[in-house]
């Protein structure tokens, strides 16, 4: 258990175990019925919300949204997932179950695993949940499960904060949590008002409680409430429904192809995300294959430098790091190598920064931990002279191979050597013309072309996108001519473990250099700074910078060094309906791409967003314009 707790770490639930049933020490109540918790969940939440029939009748390529007021052990979620599979056995119909749940005191991973051992029939699903369970830090965590058919949005924090900041409309509510007499904050009128705000005609709810003030508060918000027999020895429970004169159905994902311009890691991740939701994608790039630009290196480190203050910017970065680690684990053994990663405090400035970072923040150890020089040496498998931060769930990626793997999907069609000349709106479609005369048509277009996005995206007269290219040169070190670490090591430069006889180190940061070819000076800079970071690397004296191999790529950065994902603003001068931007990922594209692809796919498909409104503002597109526009 975490002691001396500071943000962003969440206080985990303290459990008392009695005959295998977890009870909250804080609230003095059990998480599920001692008689049969699974049967209780099915009776109270699944059957009383009419979910079996509603799941079965849901259209292909549609989605269903359930919101819950207390995640607890995840039993309600797993039972609902199992019911979804029972009613929708065709895993190719591309319907999606969104399950949104809030938890103020989340279970520690070991407690979650122990609690779910009681349900052997749910074990395959429980195992997938456990393997994807996020670190206990405050914020919104999206878990993509069941091959993409199940999307769990798990909010660690206060229920009112979560409902105020999330954008979704629920089809059904599970009003769980502990009894109103034991956990009154969960049942405040403000919380019930938010339940109504996230509902629509036809939305249903169910709760184990039958307390009068809860029933009256929900009725005052417009729900038609009823008392029905409770489960087991419980006499009564409540159900409710917002009245409607007609059936309400969720929007279905369109069957028109979406064109994505740019086949780097951002475009590839988005193409894969949309394809797995049943959206056909045409992926176009000016190069002859994917990952030809900034995503073309043989090795890339998965890391961010988290801020000393846990503000919105830091929360977004932490959320992206955690999501990317979960995302890539699906491809472990293909292009993802979870070696772990060390961030060394190799300079006086970084030592001071890490000291202040550790004084002001607490992170769970499965996300990051402070290590001494001796501990860092043991982890790296080579002498390290300074302390640092250890990220056990990070590692390195083969970016070019990742791009190729991600776009290998039957719903993705690729068009290479497609050098975009114009992007114009004609007859309710966007027409993308290439310089060789070829053209593509689509109602929706995503520009994910790095720093070239600025010349491709339609903008109002007199406007331009505040994007800039930053040259980065990496150097390939022969493994036989130096000592290499067992894990990724980062500082002023980064160094990857050996792979296929070499390791990539770098990269330079050249704001005013447009040379596309590697230079001896760039290699020498990488070597010199690597020797300062890791003297024990023992680079052979016969290695000459002019004889080393390497690669140059141009990262795309915004004016504020924050990424961009969302629809292009429209000030009514020209129609930009259906044009989206995904760019400005900078040197951390491997971290940003999975989360922002998920968020943008949510927006495009009109599904609940994985980012709350506060974090979504950090990536909005309007801030890129010289005179900011609203989206």
From Swiss-Prot:
One of its GO terms (biological process) is tRNA wobble base modification. Keywords: Cytoplasm, FAD, Flavoprotein, Methyltransferase, Multifunctional enzyme, Oxidoreductase, S-adenosyl-L-methionine, Transferase, tRNA processing. Its cofactor is FAD. Residues 1-243 are annotated as: tRNA (mnm(5)s(2)U34)-methyltransferase. Its main location: cytoplasm. In the N-terminal section; belongs to the methyltransferase superfamily. tRNA (mnm(5)s(2)U34)-methyltransferase family. Catalyzes the last two steps in the biosynthesis of 5-methylaminomethyl-2-thiouridine (mnm(5)s(2)U) at the wobble position (U34) in tRNA. Catalyzes the FAD-dependent demodification of cmnm(5)s(2)U34 to nm(5)s(2)U34, followed by the transfer of a methyl group from S-adenosyl-L-methionine to nm(5)s(2)U34, to form mnm(5)s(2)U34. NCBIfam families: MnmC_Cterm, PRK01747.1-2, tRNA_MNMC2. This is tRNA 5-methylaminomethyl-2-thiouridine biosynthesis bifunctional protein MnmC. It comes from Marinobacter nauticus (strain ATCC 700491 / DSM 11845 / VT8) (Marinobacter aquaeolei). The lineage of its organism: Bacteria, Pseudomonadati, Pseudomonadota, Gammaproteobacteria, Pseudomonadales.
